[in-house]
Amino acid sequence: MGLPKGPEGQGLPEVETREDEEQNVKLTEILELLVAAGYFRARIKGLSPFDKVVGGMTWCITTCSFDVDVDLLFQENSTIGQKIALSEKIVSVLPRMKCPHQLEPHQIQGMDFIHIFPVVQWLVKRAIETKEEMGDYIRSYSISQFQKTYSLPEDDDFIKRKDKAIQTVVDLSDAYKPRRKYRRQQGAEELLDEESRVHSTLLEYGRRHGFSRQSKTEKAEDKKTALAAGLSAAEKTDAHEEDELQAAEEQRIQSLMTKMTAMANEESRLTASSVGQIVGLCSAEIKQIVSEYEGKQSELSAEESPEKLGTSQLHQRKVISLNKQILQKTKHLEELQANHTSLQAKYSDKKKTLTELKNHGEKLDQEQAALEKLEAKADPSILQNLRALVAMNESLKSQEQEFKAHCREEMARLQQEIEILKAERAPGEKTISSGEPQGALTSTMTHNEDLDRRYNMEKEKLYKIRLLQARRNREIAILHRKIDEVPSRAELIQYQKRFIELYRQISAVHKETKQFFTLYNTLDDKKVYLEKEISLLNSIHENFSQAMASPAARDQFLRQMEQIVEGIKQSRMKMEKKKQENKMRRDQLNDQYLELLEKQRLYFKTVKEFKEEGRKNELLLSKIKAKAS
C-alpha cells in the first residue's frame, strides 16, 4: 500500500506492510476481539481498517481509565501526518499502562497487524478486567444505596424476630444462671487453705466437689468382684485406704455444710404443696409459655439448619425463585419486543428507501436505454444538427456583437450628421428670412427623411435578428438540457457504487433483523413450552392425590398421562420433521451458493482475461499507428 509517486518518478517514503493472508487473518482476529469486548463500531463496513483498529485501541485505553489526547469520533480518512500523530499519542500511553508488548507508531500507521495483535489482545483483556471491577464496585454501591432506603421481606422478618430471640436467650440465661443456695454463718471460723475456700464456695451454690459417695450395695458388689477376681493383699490395702480418704472427704464436706445456713429469700426451695398450688393456678399460662418456647426453638432451629426445612418451605422457595425467573424473562422479552419494534421501523424505512432508489434506478435505466436507442438510430444526423446549431449560435453571437458595434458606430455617425445638419439649418433659416431661394431647405428635409427611413429599417432588421437569435438560443438550451439529463459514465459508476453500498447496508440490516426474528420466535416457543410444562406439572400436582384415592381414578389418571406423553411424542416428531426439512433446505441453498460462487469466480476470471486482451489490443493498435506514421 504505497503512496503515489511524484512527477519526477521518485516515490515518497512508503510504509512497508505485508498484505498477505496472515495480515488479513490477524485483522479479522483483532476486529473479533474488539467486537467481543464491546466496541461495536468495528462492525461498520464503511470505515477503514485504520479507523477501526485505532478507534478500538483508544476505546480500550479510555475504558481502562487512562487519558488519550485524540478525537476519533467523526474524523475519518485522515492524512498521513494525522495518522502518525494519533499513533504516537496511543503509543505514548502504553508504557504508562505497563503494557508488556512493544509497539511503534509506524507499525500502527502501516497496519502491521501481526505486531498490533498482541497489544490489542492485552488491551482487550485489561479493558474486560476493568469493566468487571467497575461492575463489582457499582453493584456493591447500588446494594448499599438500596439498603439505605429499602429492605427485603427476609430482612424485615429477621429484624422482627431478632429482638424476640435476644429476649429469649436472655430469659434462658437468667433462668439457668447459677443461684446461691447456702451462706456461711456469721462468726464461723475463717478458712485458711485455698482448697477449703473453693469447696465452701461451690457448696454455697449447691455443687459438691470431691469423692462421690458409693452406696453400700455398690461396695458389696465391688468386694464380691474383687474376691472373685482374686485380688492380692496389696490391692485390698489400696481399696481400704481409698475408702478411708473418701470417708474423710465426706466428713469434711459435712463439717462445712454445718457452718452454712439456707437462703431465706425467693431463691429458696419450694415445697411440693406450694408447687402443686402454683401449677394448678397457672396451668394456662404455663401451656402458653411452653408453646411460645417451642415456636422459638423451631424458629431458631430453622435459622441454624436451613437444610432441614420441610417440603412445603422448599416448594415455596422454589416457587419464589421460579417467579423471579419468570419476571426476568418477561422483562427480557419486553426489551426484545421494543428492540424488535425499533428494528422493524428501521427496516421499513430502509425498505422504502430501497424501493424508491430501485424505482429511480429503473427509471434512469429506461431513460438511458431510450437515449441509447435514439443515439443508435439517429446519432449522426442529430449530432451534425447539434454541431450546426452550436456553430450557428456562436456565429450569431459574434454577428450580434459586430452588429451592435456597427450600430453604435452608425448611431454616432448619424448623431454627428444631425448635429452638422442642425448647425447648417440655423444659417439656412436666416437665408430664408433674408429672401434666399428654398432649394437648400428642400434638399435638407429630403436627406433627413431618408436618414429616418434607413434608421427605422435597420432597427426593424436588428429586432428580427434578435428574435431569431433568441429562438436559436432557446433550441440550443433545450438540447443542452436533454444532453445534461443523460448521466455520464462517471456518474453511472458513482450511482452503481452507491447502490451497491446501500444494498450491502440493507442486506446487513435485513440479516440482523432476521436473526432477531429467529431469536424472538425461538424464545417465544421456549416460553410457550415452559408455560405448558408448568401448567402440566401444576395439574399433575393438584390431581395426584385425588387420582391415587381410588383405582378407577388412578387408571383414568394414568390414561391421561399416556395421552399427554403420546401428544408430546407427536409434537417432538413434528419438530424433528421440520428440523430435517430445514436442514435439507439449508443444504440446497448451500449448494446454490457454491454454484453462484463458482459463477462469480468464472466471471471475474473472464473479466480479467478480457481486460488483458483489451490491453494487448491497445498495444497492437499503438504499434500499428506508430508504424503507419
UniProtKB/Swiss-Prot annotation:
It comes from the Eukaryota. GO terms for cellular component: early endosome. Keywords: Coiled coil, Endosome, Phosphoprotein, Protein transport, Transport. This is Coiled-coil domain-containing protein 93. Component of the commander complex consisting of the CCC subcomplex and the retriever subcomplex. Component of the CCC (COMMD/CCDC22/CCDC93) subcomplex consisting of COMMD1, COMMD2, COMMD3, COMMD4, COMMD5, COMMD6, COMMD7, COMMD8, COMMD9, COMMD10, CCDC22 and CCDC93. Forms a coiled-coil heterodimer with CCDC22; this heterodimer interacts with the guanine nucleotide exchange factor DENND10; the interaction is direct. Interacts with WASHC1. Interacts directly with WASHC2C. Interacts with SNX17 and SNX31. Residues 446-629 are annotated as: Sufficient for interaction with WASHC2C. The modification Phosphoserine is found at S298, S301, S305. Component of the commander complex that is essential for endosomal recycling of transmembrane cargos; the commander complex is composed of composed of the CCC subcomplex and the retriever subcomplex. Component of the CCC complex, which is involved in the regulation of endosomal recycling of surface proteins, including integrins, signaling receptor and channels. The CCC complex associates with SNX17, retriever and WASH complexes to prevent lysosomal degradation and promote cell surface recycling of numerous cargos such as integrins ITGA5:ITGB1. The keyword Transport applies. Residues 231-430, 558-599 form a coiled coil. Residues 215-225 have a biased composition (Basic and acidic residues). It holds the Pfam family CCDC93_CC. It comes from Rattus norvegicus. It is found in: Early endosome. One of its GO terms (biological process) is endocytic recycling. InterPro entries: CCDC93, CCDC93_CC, CCDC93_N. Belongs to the CCDC93 family. Residues 1-428 are annotated as: Sufficient for interaction with CCDC22.
